[in-house]
Amino acid sequence: LSYDGNSGRADATGNVVITQADKTMTGAKGWYNTKTQEANLDGGVSMIGSDMAMSAQTVHSYNNNKFTANGSVHLQRADRQIFGDSVEYSTDSEYGLVTGNARLIAEGTTLTGDKVEGWMKEVRAVAQGNVTFSNPERNVSGSADRASYTRTPN
């Protein structure tokens, strides 16, 4: 572990644990900047928060409310899940952009594509490229180049 008081950056290797607000991130190596509230972890990263969980190969976190994750990313929040090669996500807006093997699961519907944008607060998503969708409970499935999914009002 090393710390530079001028820059506010701490670097660590071996079972690194970083706690930011309600989130705890673990990984093989990483750094955290106390001045910018920016963190980076690499090597089997997991992040657990009060209402979410995520795993990835690498995670870069900004200001306690936004992150980018790469490498077999899996994010779960309530009954909604996101999978992909790369994920950018804002916990404030609950907006996510998933690229590469993108998959979104929400309310019994699975939506896949090369790229999926999701607005989790709204239960709304747009998928592009090699899109598939299915909801076995409603006996519906399909495929397209582009698809939009929104929750039906009650």
What is each PLM-predicted segment?
Residues 1-154:
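Structural signature for solvent-exposed beta-strand/loop edge elements and short helix-capping sites
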